[in-house]
């Protein structure tokens, strides 16, 4: 588990934006939503942007998280998606 200070800096529950940057893929947004749904079921409408050269996609998704542990778990699992380079 990550050792963060989210619990000191934030009040839960709260809306938390995740930005997932990965290789350009038509399925990246679906895979991001699938991971989020496992932990925080709901209706999500992620936004997607392709890099200027078309090499990467960035997916932004806003999730209402309930705890520091949920924030950290989502960071870890989103980073484990195949082709993901960064989770911000």
Swiss-Prot record:
InterPro entries: UPF0250_YbeD-like, YbeD-like_sf. It comes from the Bacteria. GO terms for cellular component: cytosol. Pfam families: DUF493. NCBIfam families: PRK04998.1. Belongs to the UPF0250 family. This is UPF0250 protein Ssed_3490. The lineage of its organism: Bacteria, Pseudomonadati, Pseudomonadota, Gammaproteobacteria, Alteromonadales.
């Amino acid at each position: 588990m990550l050792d963060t200070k989210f619990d000191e800096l934030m009040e839960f529950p709260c809306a938390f934006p995740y930005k997932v940057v990965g290789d350009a893929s038509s399925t990246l947004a679906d895979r991001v939503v699938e991971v989020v749904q496992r932990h925080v079921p709901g209706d999500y409408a992620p936004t997607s942007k392709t890099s200027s050269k078309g090499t990467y996609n960035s997916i932004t998704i806003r999730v209402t998280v309930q705890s520091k542990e949920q924030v950290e778990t989502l960071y870890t699992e989103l980073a484990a998606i195949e082709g993901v380079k960064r989770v911000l």
